[in-house]
Amino acid sequence: MIRKVIHQKLNASGDLHYLLFCEHPHVYTLGKSGEGSNLLISDEMLKRINATYYRINRGGDITYHGPGQIVVYPIFNLEAFGITLKEYIHKLEGIIILLLESYGIKATRLDGATGVWLDIGVKGRERKICAIGVRASRFVTMHGLAFNINTDLNYFSYINPCGFVDKGVTSMQVEMGKQIDMSIVKNKLERLFAAEFGFSYKK
């Protein structure tokens, strides 16, 4: 379905944009610039933990997707918004930072890396709560963000997330000490995307 929508977007001249939400089974994906050595387990172990592994054409290194994580695939025409890919990534990070702020979680960006982080500058405490890996073809965006809500963080122990060996990962559940209603988070994300990019959201 995602490939079909992208194909339609690449061949359309209108200003119609798509915002896709999903929750994946256990899977590791490696971006174009990634190192295969950042997957720390064998094929046999992948089967044992019921996970799969793919090399894909997004930016970034290795990351994990799985249950309890909201993955968002915005398929936007950046030319229609008049922004660059770098500005687009900045907007995605800003949306997550605002959402976390609404839950009382202070998050920020990390210079030289994409995604949303907590406790930057605090040695031994820096951790990522949202990974971002995107690319654009003829101004149309592909891939997106992976936001840890109630994610089983044990799956991150089998990789060097996004190539970092000195930083951790976290989730909203860990930070707040309770299970989070993912439907509420999704609805907040829909509203924040609409506000940030100035469009009305139609399901």
Q: What does each model-found stretch correspond to?
A:
Residues 83-130, 134-203:
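Long, positively charged amphipathic alpha-helical accessory segments at protein N-termini or as interdomain linkers
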